Amino acid sequence: DVPHIIQVIGRSNQFGLLGLFHDDQNPVNVDTTQNLTGLAIKRQDAIELLNQVPRWHRNLLGALGMRLHQAFTPKRIGHRPRLVAILHASEEYRHLSTTLIRRLQSLGEDVAVISDREDTRVTAKRSISLLDKHGNLRNPNEVRSEASSWATIERCVLDIQLDKNIEYLNEVLQDSDTILCCFDSNTSQETESLLFELSECHPAARKKISLVRILRGTQQVADPLKNMHSICRGDFKIHWDGFGQSCHTTRKSGIERIIRNLRGSSIGFALGGGAARGMAHLGVLSVLDEEGIPIDFLSGTSAGALTGIPYAAGYDSTWLIETFSQDLKPSKRYKFLPYGDAWYMIGKFRGGGWDDMLRTHLFDWTLEQLSIPFTSVTADLVAAEQVHRSGGDAASAILESINLPGVSPPICQNGRVLVDGGILNNVPADVLVTQGATFIVAVDVAAKIGHMFAGNDPTTPTDQMNTPNMFQTLGRVRAAQDRNIRKMGTQDTDFTIEPDVSAFQLTDFQNASAIAQQGVIATREALPQLRKLLKQLDPELFPYA
């Protein structure tokens, strides 16, 4: 038999837990991608330890709960729509359909096409025209009857201009599994009006429509929309130059995001909190860019939101490293103070410095305008629960998520008292499931914590121990909290990247470059295994060696 991967585990994880409930011994091969120390415990010894060591008992029950959650949670298999309708608000970028169809064909798909074009720019082995020989629209039932012979075709694309009367569009779109509506800023108003009219005639269309917004030239983010998101389930952005190419290297996979969505293989990355240690996320993202590892969805808590939202807005990770290093560098007056970098951070929170800094780069952009969908996590002290934000002001989403309790006053608005989301969900991988990700990678900068604190280690005699000051204590409390609470949001994670940033302080923003380098190192080490898992997800989309 050909061996296959049963499970991929990381630091502090276990396997074989369910073997406690039966005597049968099932052999399994274990391969490691790095040097590690493993502990093997026989079944009888494990049972005896349950009665002898309370901490072992608690940890085992916690691990069992997570294992049962995974066992009873259905595997995330993305939906592959068979009939895909592509609506165009302008003839100018009809070539987008050709690009998508040819890409699907390059992946081995047999694609049939129904189109209202008079030319033959859309090529497929099987095609039907919506126009008769006089150039008039054919009866939809007639077209449907002709297409009935395509029962074995795995993908059918309906390519049509959005200038038809609403009754005709409603009729031809009824059988569609998903609807991609392509438009730019010049056609957004008429597109919005038509989509609302279509959704009134065909209410089920609200669950099928995804926006495809065309961004031109140097346009970094999409224009704001008023109400269109209420009638759609997805929102793609493509930087388009008219020839199927993207204009910005950091967002060049706009078309590929649509392809992955159609194939049910969307990739999500969850960026965890960790204050300055979160600068490691930028190193991770830089390697993903260089190696062509796709990102379809992003979520982030605290530092994950601070780094992830600007990246989702199209800023290059290398530029962000330099910008954070400069923008968060303490001024000279703090250099002569004990723990001056900590006092600088407190002043930045209490003096409103974060808002000014963020809006210099994010302006008044909203999360809906960003190239990559982003969900930030904050905590509401009124309801004592998480708040997930996928829309609204981008800078405010960061401010809410990084708002450290005790350092900065809570943000009070709309019946909520908002503080740093890390107190409830420090690595929000679970958020990505509801966003539609079928493969989820967590980036955890709090996983590794050194056993040295304020000059003390586990072997330091009592009479030689140092008493930590307030800043050291607050920082260590947060690091310990982040490390232990991280598992709450990572139960749905398929893979984890853990940069070792334990040598850096939580206020070490001026060392962003060195911290980011740890993200680079961890991601380079993780790449072979990550590629292997992506290939298992979709061998055609991810043909990695």
Question: Which sequence ranges carry the predicted segments?
Answer:
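Helix-rich "cap/lid" substructures immediately adjacent to catalytic or cofactor-binding pockets
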Residues: H248-L298
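P-loop/Walker-type NTP enzyme "switch/lid" segment
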Residues: A112-Q174, A342, G351, E368, ...
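Glycine-rich phosphate-binding P-loop
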Residues: R80-L107, R117
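Catalytic nucleophile loop
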Residues: G272, P294-A313
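A small-molecule sensor/coupling module
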Residues: Q25-P27, Q44-H79
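Conserved catalytic-core segment of NTP-binding enzymes
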Residues: T152, I160-K237, G436
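Cyclic nucleotide-binding regulatory domains
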Residues: D1-N35
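Non-catalytic peripheral regions of patatin-like phospholipases
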Residues: K207-I209, R213-K252, I267, S317-H361, ...
